């Protein structure tokens, strides 16, 4: 397995597909990276030369991926919570951030249903 940005990418797949195993690289970014590195998109990872892998690593290093990207996202969310913006408050309370309704659904953010006992007659 070849290592790119600290991630073992699969050898049997095409390089464009293998690059998407790195956090922060999707299909369109992977195509741009391969194009910048002057490598054929149809090449399998096992068929790449060391020179081609080196060029791909150099291009990937110019992108923010893996730990750096995760750290930046966490810092952005913490900043929103510290300045007590509306989005930060929603993050703090574990509610949907982007304006979704919460009367019925939003179970992914709110967690399992907490049933409330009915008042007896």
Curated annotation (Swiss-Prot):
It holds the Pfam family Ribosomal_S13. SUPFAM superfamilies: S13-like H2TH domain. Residues 91-121 are annotated as: Disordered. One of its GO terms (molecular function) is rRNA binding. One of its GO terms (biological process) is translation. It comes from the Bacteria. GO terms for cellular component: cytosol; small ribosomal subunit. Keywords: Ribonucleoprotein, Ribosomal protein, RNA-binding, rRNA-binding, tRNA-binding. Belongs to the universal ribosomal protein uS13 family. Part of the 30S ribosomal subunit. Forms a loose heterodimer with protein S19. Forms two bridges to the 50S subunit in the 70S ribosome. Located at the top of the head of the 30S subunit, it contacts several helices of the 16S rRNA. In the 70S ribosome it contacts the 23S rRNA (bridge B1a) and protein L5 of the 50S subunit (bridge B1b), connecting the 2 subunits; these bridges are implicated in subunit movement. Contacts the tRNAs in the A and P-sites. This is Small ribosomal subunit protein uS13. It comes from Staphylococcus haemolyticus (strain JCSC1435).
């Amino acid at each position: 397995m070849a290592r790119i940005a600290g991630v073992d990418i699969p050898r049997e797949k095409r390089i464009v597909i293998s690059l998407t195993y790195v956090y922060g690289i999707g299909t369109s970014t992977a195509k741009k990276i391969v194009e910048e590195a002057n490598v054929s998109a149809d090449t399998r990872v096992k068929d790449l030369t060391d020179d081609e892998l080196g060029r791909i690593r150099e291009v990937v290093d110019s992108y923010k991926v893996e730990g750096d990207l995760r750290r930046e996202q966490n810092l952005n969310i913490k900043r929103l919570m510290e300045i007590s913006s509306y989005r930060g408050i929603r993050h703090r309370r574990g509610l949907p951030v982007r304006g979704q309704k919460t009367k019925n659904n939003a179970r992914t953010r709110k967690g399992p249903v907490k049933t409330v006992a009915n008042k007896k007659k």
